[in-house]
Amino acid sequence: VGSEMCIRDRNVMEKDNYQWWRRRFCKMAEYFTAYRIDHILGFFRIWEIPVHSVHGLLGQFVPSLPMSKEEIQSFGLRFQPEFMTKPFINDYILNTMFGERSEEVRQTFVQHVHHDIYEMRPEFDTQRKVEAYFAGKTDEADLDLKEGLYSLISDVLFVVDRDNPEMYHPRIAVQNDFVYRQLTGQEQEAFNRLYNHYYYQRHNDFWYREAMKKLPVLTQSTSMLVCGEDLGMVPDCVPWVMDQLQILSLEIQRMPKNPEHEFGHVSEYPFRSVCTIGTHDMSTFRGWWEEDRSVTESFYYRELGHWGDLPEHAPGWLCEEVVRRHLYSPSMLCILTWQDWTAMDESLRNPDIEIERINVPANPKHYWRWRMHITLEELMKQDAFNEKIRNMIAESGR
């Protein structure tokens, strides 16, 4: 199930003790004994993007605890609304971002304020307005210009709170942008302290209480086993709640929970977890193997302990080794994609690695169209392959 409840009216759903959700789970329990909550973080908070934005950088967590001017300054950063909450644009930025088209940007999309400082023209001061201007234009140069203007608009240090214009949120990932580079070294240090506090400490107790309003009611409404997709930017309060409610975590070796580890240690996974090689939103093991040679090199030599030449493509024996390691993990459940199972057999697996991936979240135009490349009848005839899987599962005690 998804956590789409979090973009509905929370107060209305809370008034009847989440009856709509509880009914939904009771109906599911007639057919299933376990379910996964996709993006369980949505029960703690959701990332809300304003209607005037195309990209997500100008979003803010809902619910959240925005910061006042006084609190921002308590971190040692002098708050300057004009500089910090509006796109910072100067000649250097325009020349760097747009090159030979910088003059066109000056004449059409921005207006001069003072010295070498500019601001977006009112007719182009949101990403949606820029999007409308470029509607129907497919030339690559125009598309690059549009993306550049999007970036220009999101070049702010703080996002104004959606409900209170006197409160602010540090813009996510702003350390990569021009406005951050305008700060002095001391100001950057102050901003980083504020940023880390906001994104990794400030909301833990607050979001814990938010989740505990909803999740106990829902997870205890049936006897179904509950798994949670707890990947990505996970605040500390998430494992607190999942452990308290005995919700299984999702463990993926290439997305370790410990930030000090390059890869997760399969043998150290918690019992209350689901281990898998990859999800529908990720490349298969064979696809991942060919994405970044330096990463697979580290995995091959350091994590697996092999020596000799690094295989250019993931051979069947290597795929089998990775599958076996997952089967022998302490995780309560080991659930692998069909593509990662068939990767063990070089004569059976799909020769086209690219079409094995189910979903590409970063591509809004991608749609789910994956299909097995052989029929079930053909698969049932693969006696040696099927026997191997049967033995691997039995030997691992699963």
Which residues are covered by each model-predicted region?
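Catalytic cores of glycan-processing enzymes that make or break glycosidic bonds
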Residues: 3-4, 8-398
